[in-house]
Amino acid sequence: MTASTIPRQIAIIGSGNIGTDLMIKVLRLSKTLEVGAMVGIDPDSDGLARANRLGVPTTSDGVDGLIRMPNFEAIDIVLDATSARAHAANYTALRRYRKRMIDLTPAAVGPFVVPAVNMGASLSADNVNMVTCGGQATIPIVAAISQVTPVAYAEIVASIASKSAGPGTRQNIDEFTETTAHAIEQVGGARKGKAIIILNPAEPPLIMRDTVLALIGPSDHDAVKGSIRAMVDAVAEYVPGYRLKQRIEIQPLDGLPVGTLTSEPVTHKVSVFLEVEGAAHYLPAYAGNLDIMTSAALRVAEAMAAQKLSGAVA
């Protein structure tokens, strides 16, 4: 096996729903990554039990346990699937060891990355942030509109099955809205962004649904729709269950109160309705909100590994 074919080792912090799904995705799908460690704090968690059964090295002593693992030096990339508060401590502990970090929490310590929009912009950073599930689903649409015409205001509503929201998601609700709103502006290109999350208690659970509302001025409506459709196709390359739920709507703002959400001159409202069905690698298909996060993080981790490999070869 040559250096160009040896998988790069990663560690996953957080043995909950997101961390476990990410582990299984890497094991099943990736040819360039290898799970060198699954890190948790609950020795009885299902994620650590599954990792043990699959032959993945584990520790239930958190980041301190990871640092003590015999293969720690060989780990190149650490993916953090804990919580916003925990990530700050994890980053502080690991930074001295020069490990690259992919943050799946709303902590937003490092620059935002949405693979279909700005993959190459931040890969050199030692810590990148995957925004939120709602951000990964909707920011590409805002960016697609921004590529054609300025977006004065963009609002997203992410509706996810309550059953798919674990303790970490529920603890991070405030950070979810703040981080997603900032990323709508910084990555999506909107002058003003707003984010809303809904935990839908319906039974049986419904798959993730997302609505994007954008206020724009005069523009080529066909070009806007074409840009959106192309972006949906780009996201679907790494999240196969990502799709338009219904036709794209562009309506004049005459008499619509949403026109008061911005002081800028706007003439039309763009409405985009999406749904995200999960791949059901570990979680049920309705948990598209978690699937889009782990799929996007896998995409970024593989890009980081490829970047490091190309640098080593050069």
Curated annotation (Swiss-Prot):
Alphabetical list of InterPro entries matching this protein: Acetaldehyde_dehydrogenase, Acetylaldehyde_DH_C, NAD(P)-bd_dom_sf, Semialdehyde_DH_NAD-bd
Residue numbers annotated as active site: C133
Keywords: Aromatic hydrocarbons catabolism, NAD, Oxidoreductase
Amino acids binding NAD(+): S15, G16, N17, I18, S164, A165, G166, P167, G168, T169, R170, Q171, N172, N289
EC number(s) stated in the UniProt entry for this protein: 1.2.1.10
Pfam (any one): AcetDehyd-dimer
A GO MF term: acetaldehyde dehydrogenase (acetylating) activity
SMART domains attached to this UniProt entry: Semialdhyde_dh (SM00859)
Domain of life: Bacteria
GO BP annotation list: catabolic process
Catalytic activity field: acetaldehyde + NAD(+) + CoA = acetyl-CoA + NADH + H(+)
Family the entry assigns: Belongs to the acetaldehyde dehydrogenase family.
Protein name: Acetaldehyde dehydrogenase 2
Native organism: Nocardioides sp. (strain ATCC BAA-499 / JS614)
